[in-house]
UniProtKB/Swiss-Prot annotation:
PANTHER family: ARGININE KINASE 1-RELATED, ARGININE OR CREATINE KINASE. This is Arginine kinase. Residues 56-222 form the Phosphagen kinase C-terminal domain. It comes from Chionoecetes opilio. Coiled coil: none annotated. The keyword Glycosyltransferase does not apply. Belongs to the ATP:guanido phosphotransferase family. GO terms for cellular component: extracellular space. One of its GO terms (biological process) is phosphocreatine biosynthetic process. Pfam families: ATP-gua_Ptrans. Its EC number is 2.7.3.3.
Amino acid sequence: MADAATISKLEEGFKKLQGATDCKDVFDQLKQTDKHPNKDFGDVNQFVNVDPDGKFVISTRVRLIDDHFLFKEGDRFLQAANACRYWPSGRGIFHNDKKIISMQMGGDLGQVYRRLVSAVNEIEKRVPFSHHDRLGFLTFCPTNLGTTVRASVHIKLPKXEKLEEVAGKYSLQVRGTRGEHTEAEGGVYDISNKRRMGLTEFQAVKEMQDGILELIKIEKEMQ
């Protein structure tokens, strides 16, 4: 469980977001009694190699907690979490080598996911993660509250004309080749699950898998 001070800061930031006019449509749907689902990695065998022929997916990665080691002033989510107070004074980073990331070349999402689940379960036997019944797993960046899971692929889709349409249908986030705020180079995109909160870890990764399979299907039809 998280300590009281951490919860207090999160609640304070949450109230600021509730009062933001550009967030009204989202927060009107939220209830104080809502709870984030319990951790559930589901049936790991339901995840497959999304690109067995190796024609589209360059690499696959599933990780807990987006890196966010450095950030710029002005992000409304970070401001709401009080991460930009006294800017630019007091900036510092404590960064160790404990990253929980499972990554490999190719599209074998099943193998990547199973390895991550195994690692997380072993780590939790010794070091419990901070968790809140309503907010899920707690991280510094409020956009990652909930499962904190980001499952992504680097995928080549030079002909995909329905990329944004499919991304919206499957709650996918489309980034450029080198991540957020970059362009796609040679038709290569970084595509990941968008939703973190209000669903299980299994559901988050399953959304990504279903969306990627649909994108590959459309790309093949265009060839």
